């Protein structure tokens, strides 16, 4: 139902879906540029999109629970109790979808374990730092509309080493160790989850570990994965 590199999604014949993008935190991840990219993807799919640069938007419970999709882009920083409760309750209790990428979703609020419980992983290392050439491999024995028809692909960027919830549904992985990249992890070869989905309460959750800079996600398969992930996660939309 979702061909590779489709220009449009499969939105239902009902009112427009809505998305709230909240960006901020560490500037090195270009959160403003990533927010604009995600806004454009969602707008092309017919979403009404609000973009905010304050976590106080999450504290508005009525706003959050009225959305189809919530997209955090907020590396590190801290989140207050009311801010967390707004997004947490919208996702867990009201089925509002949650989707994001890289440190903007899974290196946010590092001391907040409930955030990690909701999102499904936490960044812990990127051996070799930026500029590493590595492969992202679709998990072929786990067919899913997000990855249907898409090829494995090569990336030059940070390669995220995550601590991952064992309950997530892994759609793509990257191999560790990467040739030429040394570190204390090299004696523990593994296939690290790069793209996954999960359920959390009433909601769908989608995560893509790519996205150190906006250009990593701007074209080709990475962009298509974000597009499909947004649609799959969004309440009342789907693929």
Give residue spans per PLM region.
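Extracytoplasmic/secreted proteins, especially bacterial periplasmic and envelope-associated proteins
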Residues: 33, 37, 86, 145, ...
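Structural detector of well-ordered beta-strand residues that form the stable sheet scaffold
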Residues: 97-99, 171, 206
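A glycine-rich, often tryptophan-bearing local segment used as a flexible ligand/cofactor-contacting loop or short
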Residues: 77-149
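Conserved beta-strand segments of alpha/beta enzyme cores
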Residues: 48-50, 169, 204
């Amino acid at each position: 139902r979702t061909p590779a590199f489709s220009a449009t999604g499969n939105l239902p014949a009902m009112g427009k879906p809505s998305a709230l993008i909240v960006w901020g935190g560490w500037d090195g991840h270009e959160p403003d540029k990533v927010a604009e990219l995600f806004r454009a993807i969602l707008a092309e799919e017919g979403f009404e999109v609000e973009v905010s640069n304050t976590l106080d938007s999450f504290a508005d419970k009525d706003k959050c629970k009225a959305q189809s999709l919530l997209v955090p882009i907020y590396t590190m920083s801290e989140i207050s109790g009311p801010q967390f409760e707004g997004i947490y309750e919208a996702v867990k209790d009201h089925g509002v979808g949650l989707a994001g990428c890289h440190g903007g979703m899974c290196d946010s609020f590092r001391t907040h374990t409930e955030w990690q419980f909701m999102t499904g992983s936490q960044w812990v290392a990127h051996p070799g730092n930026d500029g590493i050439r590595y492969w992202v491999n679709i998990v072929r024995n786990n067919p899913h509309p997000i990855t249907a028809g898409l090829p494995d692909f090569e990336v030059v960027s940070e390669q995220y080493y995550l601590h991952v919830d064992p309950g997530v549904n892994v759609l793509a992985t990257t191999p560790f160790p990467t040739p030429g990249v040394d570190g204390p992890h090299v004696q523990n070869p593994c296939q690290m989850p790069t793209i996954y989905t999960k359920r959390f309460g009433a909601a769908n959750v989608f995560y893509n570990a790519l996205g150190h800079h906006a250009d990593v996600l701007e074209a080709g398969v990475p962009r298509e994965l974000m597009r499909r992930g947004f649609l799959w996660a969004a309440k009342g939309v789907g693929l």
